[in-house]
Amino acid sequence: MKKNNYVITGGLGFIGSTITKMLINKRDTGKCIIVDNYTNYINPLRWTFTDYRKLRFTNIKDKKLKKNINNKIIFYRGDCADFKIMYTILEKYKPKCVFHTAAVPVAKIENPNVSEFRKGSIDTTINILDCLDLIQKKSKYKIGRFVYISSSMVYGDFLKKQAFEDDSRRPKEIYGTMKLAGEEIVKGFSRFSKIPYTIIRPSAAYGPTDMNERVTQFLLLKAINNGILEIHGKDEKLDFTYVEDLAEGTIKAAFNKNGENETFNITTGSGRTILSYAKILKK
């Protein structure tokens, strides 16, 4: 059986690590190469802080998963916007797919830095695509799919109960704006470089080892510690999506021929108010 390699940028992150752990359990997986700059965006002095990066690939009880982590994952500490780093990795391992999850997390939205968001969503994307294009021109290697993890924040305010992929995109925050710009770069590159892509738009991901201070994590920790659940914007609706469902859907879209050069919302498909989420936690 032919073994396939996969590169996961931001592979120590919440979504990237979940995708990686699913990939390494596939029989045809050779190596999963994680490229991550090991940056911690959360203040370690905050009461909610736990460095889940250390837990995502350690203290694993599942023996098969633990064995595969030790045998199939290669870690690189580096900046995905660095041409030399990414070119060297991509040329060496010639991955079947690149899962580009690296970006400044949404937690930074309260203190936005435009250049930081641009580097996370745009500069890294351009650099990786540049490297892939150059390697393909110099060899017989052809990448199977470039998977770009975008965000439902590209839509801005939801005008309907459920968002569809071809709905208007009017992001309100710099995060969504940069993610949307990244999408257009991926599509533009594909037109002249013939790099097949899949764009994924997650929404309100939650689950084990989330440390990005999303509202789901914040309220859950409050509930565990018998704290008061303070709700702001109680009528605001979010399409909460379990991270393992998101990872599974992303991998299926990446491996399916019908997912080539397509964009997918991977969400639960219906909104739930933050207040109703809090009531569930109180039970």
PLM regions: where:
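N-terminal Rossmann-like NAD(P)+-binding domain of SDR-like oxidoreductases, especially those catalyzing
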Residues: M1-R201
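Short aromatic-enriched loop/helix-cap "lid" or pocket-rim segments at secondary-structure transitions
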Residues: N43-T48, F158-K161, D210-E213, E244, ...
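Protein kinase-like catalytic domain
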Residues: D133, S190, I224, A254-F255
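Hydrophobic alpha-helix immediately C-terminal to the catalytic Tyr-X-X-X-Lys motif of short-chain
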Residues: A181, I185, F189, L219, ...
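Glycine/proline-rich active-site loop of Rossmann-fold NAD(P)-dependent oxidoreductases
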Residues: T29, L180, A205-F218, G227, ...
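Hydrophobic "lid"/C-terminal helical patch
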Residues: I19, A247-A254, A278-L281
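Conserved sequence/active-site signature of Rossmann-fold short-chain dehydrogenase/reductase
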Residues: A81, V154-Y155, A205-G207, E236, ...
